[in-house]
Amino acid sequence: MNMKLHGFLIGSDIQVDIDNKRLIRISSENSYKVLNLSAVVLKDTVMKLLIFLLTHASDHVVSNEEILQKVWEENNLSSSNQRLWQVVTELKEKLSLIGMPQDFIINRRGEGYKLNSPRITPLYYKQ
């Protein structure tokens, strides 16, 4: 039985849906039992970067060089530090639209990037 990565759960209320390139947040206000739903769609490279960071940068800093190699070059895309900065900025903007804190992605100047999240859970399904 093969297991395939479907996405991730960040904290308890944000789901990363890889196949549909979506981030979905479902939060509730307990006093009124109201559910709030917010969702954003990500471009291909932005989603690839997010998947890479969720997989590799939750417990240590991942170098810019490693990110450029794995996210850009291994997907036959042209890589540069400027392009990395642009895509990280776009990802941070999308994350903020669904209520993620600005410091979810931390840039360690001269080193690389790390995620600031207490709980990232990969979600798999049977093929």
Spans of model-derived segments:
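DNA-binding patch around the recognition helix
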Residues: 2-20, 40-41, 86-126
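Short, Lys/Arg-enriched N-terminal segment that forms or immediately precedes the first helix
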Residues: 19-38
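Short amphipathic alpha-helical recognition elements used for nucleic-acid or partner binding
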Residues: 34-71, 91
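Short helix-coil junctions and helix-kink-helix linkers
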Residues: 70-78
